[in-house]
């Protein structure tokens, strides 16, 4: 009897094989499925081969065939790497708490993220898997880690693969922990200064070992006095205008991590000269060589 038809089914499609007269074998070129086989049963695509002769007899070979079953399983591997997206902290962030929360997503839209391949390194320390919380999400995992870090700069490295062995592009995040406020020393004006000059120089020096440069703000009775230039050594000086009476001057310095220091000065501005309202001499006239009293009546605001 002659072979009437040879077909093979794969992923819902049926393909007709034709006989190669040179080899005597039945052949067909098939385009592999566009999706990985990892999420299929047994991580394989199942193929079913059917051979029919002229009499209508059919031989079927599938995954359960005792001799050829393994040949009916097709392993398809995708070639698109998973994607790592850092969430926090952001690149270049300044944090004012030594307890640092690290969070990132890893996703893959085909074979799926290999959970065990997700690794996190903080500076030179490889974080153990049991310290990383990995919560399944649509297409991957949201990963979280909380740890205590010393003040200073830090680097996070994140790596992952999918189930087909594709390696994600490593993500690196650098950030700074700074829990110490900047220093602030005010050289002028002196606390309690009383002056008849409207212009007053506010000067001092500031420094932050971790999060320089800092910003300095000056207010008088709550009114902002504008930009304060700071030198390379942290020194600053700004001429401000006082108002008549009591002036509460607040100088505040803040670093990039949001830590701040503040100094207050109270300065009184009085430009009104005292008034002489009366002069009395008793006795007048006075005998030569005798004592007399001078009394002056003055006022000042």
How would you describe each model-predicted region?
Residues 1-3, 108-115, 207-216, 299-301:
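Extracellular acidic loop/turn motifs
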Residues 22-34, 135-144, 231-237:
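Aromatic sugar-binding surface patches on proteins
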Residues 92-98, 191-198, 284-290:
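Short, solvent-exposed loop/linker segments at the N-terminal edge
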